């Protein structure tokens, strides 16, 4: 690629990141399972400590493919208490300009503490291919009881 092509590719990727950043947040807040799934590739992988807290048969915390994601989003939407996430973000996100999109739901929100986590996504072909969610100390404390029930 020449310099102009690199600039265009970076601009296109930035547009994809902007779209995913806004649409993922809005669709998750609205519990829009089909809308969320449309942001993921058919064979996407999602890893989160919330997975075994929601799905008893997924104790490794890893979901593979849209059908497993669908089950998690549907059940998670049904079981999500209002206080779990306040959905406050600073509006800032990070990217390497090629494949990564990262943002934070910080613990300290304007109206008090919220679940603290970081969304880390690998984007391929305009879709989320690999999504990892890292939970902070406040969030881990909230889901710890559900996680311990699946421990040996």
Regions from the language model: what does each represent?
Residues 1-12, 74-152:
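A beta-strand edge to alpha-helix "cap/lid" segment located at domain peripheries
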Residues 1-42, 149-152:
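Short, low-complexity N-terminal intrinsically disordered segments enriched in polar/charged residues
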Residues 3-6, 18, 26, 51, ...:
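Generic, low-specificity signal for short hydrophobic/alpha-helical stretches with a mild N-terminal bias
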Residues 14, 33, 37-94, 99:
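A solvent-exposed, acidic/Ser-Thr-rich amphipathic alpha-helical stretch
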Residues 21, 28, 40, 69, ...:
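Hydrophobic alpha-helical core bundles mediating ligand binding, dimerization, or RNAP-core interactions
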Residues 30-32, 56, 116, 121:
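Preference for short coil/turn "hinge" residues that link or interrupt alpha-helices
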